[in-house]
Amino acid sequence: FAMLNASGCNIGNFAMPFAQGFLGPVGVIAVSLFDCGNSMICLGGAYSIASIVKSGDGKFRIKPILNNLVHSIPLMTYIFMTILGLLHLSLPAPVVEFAGIVGNANAFMAMLMIGVGFHLNGDPSQIGDIIKILGVRYIIGIALALAAYFILPLPLEYRQALVIVFLAPVASANPPFTAQMGSDFGLASAINSVSIIASIVLITTALVIML
């Protein structure tokens, strides 16, 4: 459960708007490049590994991981569009227009799903789990953000973009994958919601300092 719900970064619904608003085209490119690897984790990678760990047989098998990745429609769509981009091909205008209409509902549907699933029963252990999982997540995230900003020999805009993505909330796909794995969907939604609030504070503070 912790492995799945501490992984991934919410790029499209969260980090990208910050990059567009404050960092401009270079920041958007940097965030998009980061999301190429991030999507592999968010859209099936973390779920596959967490499922293997939950099974408890102690055997690491690559076939189930690849099987889950291949059957992940969002990931396959992402890869398909990346290939089209590399080949300098584009979809017909009506398809792009329709996809844009559907895509505009993505953020709303993600937040609706998290809101519907949000459930805390008042058990102190749940609060403890949230603090423990997000504590580890943000300690690592802050350390990576500091390292990226002060150590990496990259242009300033790229380092600023990395700070944003490392401080981003956990992936919005985590709760449905948690439910699919048979774990606590309500707690996963609560972790996701709290991480959004924490990331707003952290990223806003970071932008004030960096800009």
PLM feature segments, named:
Residues 1-211:
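Alpha-helical transmembrane segments of multi-pass small-molecule/ion transporters
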